[in-house]
Amino acid sequence: MKHKPETAAFSLIRPLEAWAANANKACNTKKMLPCLGRKWMRLSTRNLKPTWNLINVVDASKTIVRGISGGAETIAKERVDTVVIGAGVVGLAVARELSLRGREVLILDAASSFGTVTSSRNSEVVHAGIYYPPNSLKAKFCVRGRELLYKYCSEYEIPHKKIGKLIVATGSSEIPKLDLLMHLGTQNRVSGLRMLEGFEAMRMEPQLRCVKALLSPESGILDTHSFMLSLVEKSFDFMVYRDNNNLRLQGEAQNNHATFSYNTVVLNGRVEEKKMHLYVADTRFSESRCEAEAQLELIPNLVVNSAGLGAQALAKRLHGLDHRFVPSSHYARGCYFTLSGIKAPPFNKLVYPIPEEGGLGVHVTVDLNGLVKFGPDVEWIECTDDTSSFLNKFDYRVNPQRSEKFYPEIRKYYPDLKDGSLEPGYSGIRPKLSGPKQSPADFVIQGEETHGVPGLVNLFGIESPGLTSSLAIAEHIANKFLR
């Protein structure tokens, strides 16, 4: 049976930048009723007219304390089974997988909805698994994740298309690098890879110019928002949200067990009696004060730190976790420009140059609506990771002058690109574990066997191919860390 997610009830809309820009806007509580400081009473969704009820368990005006010391006993405590911190695509995938396996999951995110940061600011590409060292987590999860992702998209009618990719060498000096990519892809068991002479590639794509190309037929594109929305729907029994000041229910009546708490920031935590204690607050409440104040103490059996850009900063605020196990943070901003003044996309396939330092190069993608995007570039950002919320930390504006560097790079493989045809699109920040002139780092997934903290799983450096790998990462966490 096919399942198709409903999207009309949500205000997150295309184009992508309009949706992604929500990260810089004030929280809108009309979109979703936050459950911070409240206990959800689950009612059967078997009824034709399901009802809802909320039981207040904390009066924030009377029970707030500072930090995690002293009067911490005065705030409400809530024992929960599993907490997933971060409602990006990986966090959503983890929450879904754990809930499918019978765990009660609470998903916390500082934003007012899911997927507002890195997950909404990328190329929306399904990667085949070519670029990564054999036996690395990136290689393993990308290949497995691609299989799971295509299967999921087909089953639930998520818009996607396996359009293929050409990685191109535009000069003879780049051919050895292309050969290396072919070798890596073969080692990673990526099927269908084929080396093409320049004329063969240009026969496929007449606007292309190259001397050689690597064809990856398994690469593709998908609608990331529809995918994330589906993950949300597959994680919970029902969701309460506000629509014109009326409370409504939305979601499929499935027997999964997950609760979403948006506008919720994890201030800090500590290990006590082999349990992680988390101290949380309403994002808007905490950001309005110089010193953040906890409003609720959560005591979970399992914590998955999937906070993306904020994962390391959060880990450093968990007292009892040795900071030696927290890798350094590096942030790389990537800008995208859209192609204007065209009647039809110049390419049918994804076209990628030879990878550059810090990224895969300024490539061309065509989304499912026919919008042609070029990017991202790489701009290293000097930044510290000592803040509790990343909602307004980064500047996502695209400087139109950056297009001056795009034109010569793109014209290496697309010489007919016209002056003035690039318009600022959007930008994203990549959570990297390696900096400039350093070798690319692998994903880091840590459990108790690494850092010694019971019930804590840290996910660090989940950059590309994080979207493609999301379902495989979730599968791995469920298989390895569920007891």
Swiss-Prot record:
Transmembrane segments: none annotated. Its EC number is 1.1.99.2. It is found in: Mitochondrion. It catalyses: (S)-2-hydroxyglutarate + A = 2-oxoglutarate + AH2. It is an enzyme of class 1 (oxidoreductase). Optimum pH is 7.4. Pfam families: DAO. Keywords: FAD, Flavoprotein, Mitochondrion, Oxidoreductase, Transit peptide. InterPro entries: FAD-dep_OxRdtase, FAD/NAD-bd_sf. It comes from the Eukaryota. GO terms for molecular function: (S)-2-hydroxy-acid oxidase activity; 2-hydroxyglutarate dehydrogenase activity; FAD binding. Its cofactor is FAD. GO terms for cellular component: mitochondrion. Residues 1-67 form a transit peptide. The keyword Disulfide bond does not apply. Disruption phenotype: No visible phenotype under normal growth conditions. Belongs to the L2HGDH family. Catalyzes the oxidation of (S)-2-hydroxyglutarate to 2-oxoglutarate. Is specific for the (S) enantiomer and possesses very poor activity toward (R)-2-hydroxyglutarate. Has no activity toward related 2-hydroxy acids, such as glycolate, L-lactate or D-lactate. This is L-2-hydroxyglutarate dehydrogenase, mitochondrial.
